[in-house]
A protein has these predicted regions:
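Acidic, metal-coordinating helix/loop segments flanking the phosphotransfer/catalytic sites
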Residues: 37, 52-80
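Acidic catalytic/metal-coordinating carboxylates
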Residues: 55, 91-94
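Active-site residues of response regulator receiver
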Residues: 83-85
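The feature encodes the CheY-like receiver
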Residues: 88
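Short amphipathic alpha-helix used as the core "switch/output" element in two-component signaling
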Residues: 93-105
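Hydrophobic/aromatic residues positioned on beta-strands within the core alpha/beta folds
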Residues: 110-113
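C-terminal output helix
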Residues: 135-147
Length: 155
């Protein structure tokens, strides 16, 4: 049985051919890396479709290499970015802002321990909807619900 998310997120409108949805996650906590890997694998994503990095600079480096090297198979373009706001090297908000500036149509999901009241102006300025913010600790079904939502246009 094919998981719903694979059908919803990976259906190509240009052809019948299936395109994998790729997810890049910036999260400093290695225990949470394991959870993301389990969650996404359980929901039908292959290991090659999901990459988890420990900091914002590595995330931005991957994005930069994608844009400059079209033959780089390891780092093909990502469709969804899940960014923790409390990264150790650079603010997750800054990472999200740089992604939005470079890739304006890509989906960005923030994870945070801040309350929505404390970050609403920051997410508005980046162009992230409050529905695309996960508040830690979150449960698996919260992540699935966000991933199941159709992608949004951000212009």
């Amino acid at each position: 049985m094919t998981p719903t998310i694979m059908t919803d997120l990976n259906q190509s409108t240009e052809s019948q051919k299936r395109k994998s949805t790729r997810i890049l996650i910036a999260e400093p906590d290695s225990d949470i890396h394991v959870l993301y890997s389990l969650f996404t694998k359980q929901y039908g994503f292959s290991i090659s479709d999901v990459k988890v990095v420990q900091n914002g600079n590595k995330c931005l480096e991957i994005i930069h290499s994608n844009r400059n090297d079209n033959n780089n198979n390891e780092n093909n373009d990502y469709d969804i970015f899940i960014i923790y706001t409390h990264l150790s090297d650079i603010s997750g908000f800054e990472v999200a802002r740089k992604i939005r500036n470079r890739l304006p149509h890509k989906r960005i999901i923030l994870t945070t321990t801040y309350s929505l009241d404390n970050i609403s102006s920051m997410i508005d300025s980046i162009g992230i909807k409050s529905q695309d913010v996960l508040f830690k600790p979150f449960i698996y079904s919260d992540l699935v619900s966000i991933l199941k939502e159709p992608g949004r246009s951000y212009n």
